[in-house]
């Protein structure tokens, strides 16, 4: 699991308030995991837009881990949550984004995500100098690893088809990270201790996806290849 570095007291940090809407909650009115993932994407986009940096690169999520604060109230319908985000570290061709969810001045959950920049052709590239100009101080020269591990799918895993929908795909032509979290939300419901989603390969339009699962783990499998893996603790 990723390390959750504390909120930086130097360099750039960005905060924005969001209202939890009807499409973000389950039948109990609690924030769904995919709703939380969308907020993480939104505040990352809003932060990057606010910097004013002009770039043709597109950042995609490689891995996201959410940790939920014991004893805190779970966000629910119409709550106003404040998301504070900053760069927690960098690697050669990736960066870590840390984000805190605060509800009424109380921390409810934390997230750490590895993002990878892609050029207009869709290929990974090194982190640009313009990125370090903005986020270098908050990263504090902390190096983060881009390596990800993969546990094999056990033979006794439960398997079910996960049909892809037109609405699952984003401007890159891949299944969006938040759509993947929708599948996770079908099998894992809050509250829980922590959950981590790792993208080993992108899910494409022609893929026929099988969800394999055991307690504590989920795999998105295409033709015997794991493209996304999930770990969680309730």
Show which residues each predicted segment covers.
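HotDog/MaoC-like acyl-thioester-processing domains
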Residues: 11, 65-152, 202-208, 214-234
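C-terminal accessory segment of soluble enzyme catalytic cores
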Residues: 195-202
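Hot-dog-fold acyl-thioester-processing enzymes
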Residues: 1-63, 116-194
